[in-house]
Amino acid sequence: MTAVTSDGTPQAAKVRVRFCPSPTGVPHVGMVRTALFNWAYARHTGGTFVLRIEDTDADRDSEESYLALLDALRWLGLNWDEGPEVGGPYGPYRQSQRTDIYREVVAKLLATGEAYYAFSTPEEVENRHLAAGRNPKLGYDNFDRDLTDAQFSAYLAEGRKPVVRLRMPDEDISWDDLVRGTTTFAVGTVPDYVLTRASGDPLYTLVNPCDDALMKITHVLRGEDLLSSTPRQVALYQALIRIGMAERIPEFGHFPSVLGEGTKKLSKREPQSNLFAHRDRGFIPEGLLNYLALLGWAIADDHDLFSLDEMVAAFDVVDVNSNPARFDQKKADAVNAEHIRMLDSEDFAGRLRDYFTTHGYHIALDPANYEAGFVAAAQLVQTRIVVLGDAWDLLKFLNDDEYSIDSKAAAKELDADAGPVLDVACAVLDSLVDWTTASIEDVLKVALIEGLGLKPRKVFGPIRVAATGALVSPPLFESLELLGRARSLQRLSAARARVTSA
């Protein structure tokens, strides 16, 4: 659908998109994908990204969820140009603060005949359908469109409180969806719908398109679960244009569903849906956003990895695929791992330090050289992890209170053959003056491989298990340097005693 002015002529405008979540529960990855696509399109076109909070449901909305939404967007780097805590020319940007605006709009719709009061109860609607031989579940039958004054007064006298319904047009409603192509709802398939409850409280069906119109939104880009509401909203835009409260009908694009297991939409009950669960595991924003972008869009056929800047340069909503996309945790993990590897070492160390601090992790390093030691430790694991949380399992051996020798590792490596290896290792390391990775590697290779004539696997396996407690660890010689001379020798000696006692 081409954007039009009030006189029906095409009008070009700077792109204005909006992301308008409801503050309920925790942020869902499907919702984040919608925010990302809107943000990327605004940045690609040089437009404006508006954040609007749809908090008109007092029973479900919460301040905690509202703050979680802001936290999520900030962590991901999806900054908004207008909205809460930023301001803008069309505020306020929380719908709970716009009640007077909605009352004014409804009053004008009623005064011009675009909307009307409706008194029919659901039971009355069903009975009328039955009497006419129709399916009683067809929904509202537009009965109250043309009530006489006498009928209106009689209903009021009964104490009935009416809802307000929009008068739907007597013609098909079509639009050129930017993702799905031409979409049409035939006349009669969408009945006159409710704008306000009998209490006067506005519904989503009113406030969403009303705010889009008043905030001059040019593109409504959202999930396909809202597709069925679009003909209602198009009709309301048309009415708002006629009463002089809107300039245009925005363009629409409906993104494909994000699926979980099987063919079902990814449910909030599934752990993969929870944005913060991914953050807690140690996803970095670049990795998660890259993967979410792949749920319906691709930068090119031959590669899946890209930066946010590269996405902005390439993203166009018309390139979004209309087919449902399945959330694949293994694929998401793989993408995140690649982005971790692409970070420079200082950046990675800083992020890992922040992650450890948030989760109460602390690795024991030389206090006099802690920062350099942490960077060195981070470098050892950067190419070996999928999420930041994996680093703790690899580095916690540096803490004496976390260190213990795994029983399976001991059974495999600390057998009788390990005794001579550990004896020689303790001797040469105890006399080593230069406690550096290169020196540690040199003396151990000379003494054990050349001196004892053993293969590397036979000599370094016992030392690795003795020093780290595990079969898999960061590089051995670097790990010994980080442990320091005293703790390394203490652990190797304790492991040697374990071999003897066995």
Curated annotation (Swiss-Prot):
One GO-annotated biological process of the protein: glutamyl-tRNA aminoacylation
EC number in record: 6.1.1.17
Motif 'KMSKS' region location, chain numbering: 265-269
Positions contributing to ATP binding: K268
Catalytic activity: tRNA(Glu) + L-glutamate + ATP = L-glutamyl-tRNA(Glu) + AMP + diphosphate
Enzyme class: ligase
Pfam family, any one: tRNA-synt_1c
Keywords for the protein's UniProt record, in alphabetical order: Aminoacyl-tRNA synthetase, ATP-binding, Cytoplasm, Ligase, Nucleotide-binding, Protein biosynthesis
CC annotations in GO: cytosol
Residues annotated as transmembrane: none
Subcellular location, principal: cytoplasm
InterPro entries: aa-tRNA-synth_I_cd-bd, aa-tRNA-synth_I_codon-bd_sub2, aa_tRNA-synth_I_cd-bd_sf, Glu-tRNA-ligase_bac/mito, Glu-tRNA-synth_I_codon-bd_sub1, Glu/Gln-tRNA-synth, Glu/Gln-tRNA-synth_Ib_cat-dom, Glu_tRNA_lig_a-bdl
SUPFAM superfamilies according to UniProt: An anticodon-binding domain of class I aminoacyl-tRNA synthetases, Nucleotidylyl transferase
Domain of life (superkingdom): Bacteria
Subcellular location: Cytoplasm
Protein family membership: Belongs to the class-I aminoacyl-tRNA synthetase family. Glutamate--tRNA ligase type 1 subfamily.
HAMAP family: Glu_tRNA_synth_type1
Subunit-structure text: Monomer.
Role, per record: Catalyzes the attachment of glutamate to tRNA(Glu) in a two-step reaction: glutamate is first activated by ATP to form Glu-AMP and then transferred to the acceptor end of tRNA(Glu).
Protein name, UniProt field: Glutamate--tRNA ligase
Organism: Mycobacterium leprae (strain TN)
Gene name per UniProt: gltX
